[in-house]
Amino acid sequence: MNSMLFSSLTIAGAICGYLIGGGFASGQELLQYFASYGLKGLGAVAVSFLIMVFCVVNFLTVGKKENIQNAHDAFTYYCGKKAGSFFEFIAFTYLIVQVIVFFTGAGATIAQGFDVSPFVGSAIMGVLVIITVMLGLRKLIDIVGSLGVLLVVMVIGITGTFLLKNPSAIIEGSEQVATMSNILQPSKNWAVSGFLYMTFNLLGLAAFMPLLGQKSESQSENVFGGVLGCVAFCGTIVLVMLAFLTDIGNVGTKLVPNLYLAQQLHPTLASFFSIVILLGIYTGCALMYWNFCSRVVPENSKYYKPFVIILGVFGIIFGSILPFDVAINIIYQIYGYLGTLFLFFVIAKFFMKKKSGK
């Protein structure tokens, strides 16, 4: 029993760790996809939860049942060879696109936290990531990546503390946000927003979750761990969203809303939180950039380092031009709609298996 509980908690932690990175910690995506709708955002969270729990549990259990060994196997299982290759390619392109978003997020975080130009932050993050990927400093990424737990704890602690300061302001904030036009939204409809929030994450989850499920000891662990991870993740979204609503007039003007909350609690806390966010961005960014570059050009090729440098410079340029909120709004919407197409395949496969009794 204890072994099953530990394994389930490990699965739940992996789910949250995958989804809660530097981008989530900034709060910008949660502002757009949930808080911008006021208390209707709770409905958006519910929509996200339903899609998430269905897909995550399905991915985990299929991974074990079908002995999925890699992302190619997963996409082929759900979509067939041709469509599977297409979605695998889309998931692959998401790596480099997300790197650009991370560069933009680093620029916004440093600009808001230390009052410098966003280009400085994007450039510093870009150079660090390029050097890391060129030199193969995988161990450094693993060490910094262990701070992911601290990032999650700080987000929960900061937003929870801020929420407790004035919980009665939630209703007022919900009414106020309806009159604000400066906050970008993925859709005018809260339900569509909740739907897109999970579908833009879907291709990445489909590439990762089946492999996680394949390594578990039992399907019970997969189901319990999957549901627990979804509850924890969506519960964190609710906490952050409600905290935003208590001061939406100011939060809605910030590119890094969670950092603003930390600044209101204590300047030292805000400075430390800025660094933790940047380390979270660095970890996710370096891993994604490494995976992308090494799949395009082999690491032992003489073209590998020039490719890493040139592509990284382009990433820095795009990352410093695009405002963080605009980057999230446009890019995540595009991948949300692509993820919606993939969701149809997942649902169709589920019912086909049910019908055949397999």
Model-based region annotation:
Residues 5-9, 33-60, 224-238, 333-344:
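Extracellular loop-to-transmembrane helix junctions
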Residues 106-108, 117-125, 132-165, 328-346:
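Membrane-interface loop-to-helix entry segments
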Residues 72-78, 102-122, 213-234, 287-310:
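Helix-loop-helix connectors at the membrane interface of multi-pass transporters/channels
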Residues 45-56, 99, 150-162, 224-249, ...:
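Selective recognition of specific alpha-helical transmembrane segments in multi-pass small-molecule
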Residues 22, 92, 96, 129, ...:
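Hydrophobic alpha-helical segments and their helix-loop junctions in multi-pass secondary transporters
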Residues 6-25, 44, 91-95, 99, ...:
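Hydrophobic, membrane-embedded alpha-helices of multi-pass small-molecule transporters
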Residues 177-183, 244-267:
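Membrane-interface interhelical connector segments
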Residues 2-4, 36-42, 65-94, 112-118, ...:
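Transmembrane-helix boundary/entry motifs in multi-pass membrane transporters
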